């Protein structure tokens, strides 16, 4: 039997499918979000799987965005200088034309989760906005997926997730500013850093040839151990406490910092490998019994 159709000749699930939107384009400087690798030719299906997973996690962590929207915006404005606030308000005014609903004249709220088609094989990207902190958001998801009590396989096409806290243009001077912004709280802030860490830098480049991989690594290592720092962090490629992830795509560089359990416990945030490992352990346990 064929699928049920309504009076207009459309199938019953057409409205649900319309809710899923993928924008096309490049990643702007300052973008926060989550890269996801997936099976070849299944980029859209992977994005749909992630949309369900991400929206559930968003509701769990943050609830209805309307409740905290004004508060987060006020906090953001407090952190800005007067000059920056004026610039921000001008940018918001300029963006009202594209953000207005023509039928009602009301400005649409920006979605905290927005998928972007990068036109790159086996990769999709989800742009995030406040209150989402990408690295914390992804870690919470990985904890759920790694839970041995949770044996439901939520995804089929998704492979690896990589959060980026912020991003910048593919220029060395911009990379330096980005690195100082991202790594500072993890390596230089005495209120957060309690010891000398072993760390490593992992660089992934896709359609990117602007800056050499080793130049990126050497620069980031130099900034971690900057002159005048009260800490003496050391490079350890295998047994690191912290890993600095650098994602380079076309003209954009994204960066974040994750803990050592990224590799030891969460399979480098590879969802597929995490599932396989969990199911294998469950099978071995059943055989022994």
From Swiss-Prot:
InterPro entries in UniProt: THUMP_dom, THUMPD1-like
Organism for this UniProt entry: Saccharomyces cerevisiae (strain ATCC 204508 / S288c) (Baker's yeast)
Gene assigned in the entry: TAN1
Domain THUMP, residue spans: 146-259
GO biological process: tRNA modification
Protein name, per record: tRNA acetyltransferase TAN1
Keywords: Acyltransferase, Cytoplasm, Nucleus, Phosphoprotein, RNA-binding, Transferase, tRNA processing
Keyword Cell inner membrane tagged: no
Major place of residence: cytoplasm
A GO cellular-component term linked to this record: nucleus
EC number in record: 2.3.-.-
Lineage: Eukaryota, Fungi, Dikarya, Ascomycota, Saccharomycotina
Residue segments, region Disordered: 1-31, 64-83
Entries under SUPFAM superfamilies matching the protein: THUMP domain-like (SSF143437)
């Amino acid at each position: 039997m064929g699928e049920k159709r309504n009076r207009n000749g459309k199938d019953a699930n057409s409205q649900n499918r319309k809710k899923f939107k993928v924008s096309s384009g490049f990643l702007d400087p300052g973008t926060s979000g989550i890269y996801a690798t997936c099976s070849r030719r299944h980029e859209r299906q992977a994005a749909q799987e992630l949309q369900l997973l991400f929206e559930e996690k968003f509701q769990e962590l943050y609830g209805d965005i309307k409740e905290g929207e004004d508060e987060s915006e006020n906090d953001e404005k407090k952190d800005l200088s007067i000059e920056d606030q004026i610039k921000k308000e001008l940018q918001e005014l300029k963006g009202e034309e594209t953000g207005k609903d023509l039928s009602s004249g009301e400005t649409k709220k920006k979605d905290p989760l927005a998928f972007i088609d990068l036109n790159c094989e086996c990769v999709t990207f989800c742009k995030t906005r406040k209150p989402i902190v990408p690295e914390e958001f992804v870690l919470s998801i990985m904890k759920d997926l790694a839970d041995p009590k949770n044996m439901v396989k939520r995804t089929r096409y998704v492979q690896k997730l990589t959060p980026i806290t912020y991003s910048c243009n593919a220029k060395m001077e911009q990379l330096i500013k980005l690195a100082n912004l991202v790594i500072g709280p993890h390596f230089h802030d005495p209120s957060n850093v309690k010891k000398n860490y072993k760390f490593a830098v992992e660089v992934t480049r896709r359609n990117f040839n602007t800056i050499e991989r080793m130049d990126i690594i050497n620069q980031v290592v130099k900034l971690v151990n900057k002159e005048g720092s009260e800490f003496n962090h050391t490079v350890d490629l295998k047994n690191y406490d912290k890993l600095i992830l650098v994602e380079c795509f076309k003209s954009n560089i994204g960066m974040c910092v994750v803990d050592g359990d990224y590799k030891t416990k969460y399979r480098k945030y590879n969802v597929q490998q995490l599932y396989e490992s969990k199911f294998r352990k469950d099978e071995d346990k059943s055989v022994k019994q």
